[in-house]
Amino acid sequence: MAGPSLACCLLGLLALTSACYIQNCPLGGKRAAPDLDVRKCLPCGPGGKGRCFGPNICCAEELGCFVGTAEALRCQEENYLPSPCQSGQKACGSGGRCAVLGLCCSPDGCHADPACDAEATFSQR
């Protein structure tokens, strides 16, 4: 009697779990795998040295950020591309990424953020 009950309980627990098994589990677990569909945002600014951080925001490490200027016009092309993009490597603020030293940018704008210290780098490196 205890054998079938134990087997049913184990099968029930197995059905309810969604664990990674040894063959297919990435290092760090299921959610640790990087999103492979994200590409680098378009280059922008003088000499293409910057990257788009929003439809009107272009940031270049050496030059700072251009918001709503002619240097950022190319960034509007991102609205017409089918795949998402990401600039900057370090997350900051509410859905933003570190753009230049001390500055966090999201598609809505940029603001000063202490999380964007000297380690904030561009993904183009």
Swiss-Prot record:
State its location(s). Secreted
**Which UniProt key words apply to this protein?**
Amidation, Cleavage on pair of basic residues, Disulfide bond, Hormone, Pharmaceutical, Secreted, Signal
Listed as disulfide-bonded, the cysteine pairs are 20-25, 41-85, 44-58, 52-75, 59-65, 92-104, 98-116, 105-110
The protein's matches in SUPFAM superfamilies, at most eight in alphabetical order, are given as: Neurophysin II
Phenotype upon changing residue 28 to V: Gain of antagonist activity on V1aR/AVPR1A (and loss of agonist activity on this receptor)
Q: Work out whether the entry's keyword set contains Disulfide bond.
A: yes
Gene3D superfamilies noted in UniProt: Neurohypophysial hormone domain (2.60.9.10)
Instruction: Check the UniProt entry and state the signal peptide residues, or none.
Output: 1-19
Point out residues bearing the modification Glycine amide. Answer: 28
Query: Where is it mostly found?
Result: secreted
This entry carries the following GO cellular component terms, namely: extracellular region; extracellular space; neuronal dense core vesicle; secretory granule; terminal bouton
Per UniProt, subunit arrangement is: Interacts with oxytocin receptor (Ki=1.5 nM). Interacts with vasopressin V1aR/AVPR1A (Ki=37 nM), V1bR/AVPR1B (Ki=222 nM) and V2R/AVPR2 receptors (Ki=823 nM).
Q: Which family does it belong to?
A: Belongs to the vasopressin/oxytocin family.
Name the job this protein performs. Answer: Neurophysin 1 specifically binds oxytocin.
What's the name of the protein? Oxytocin-neurophysin 1
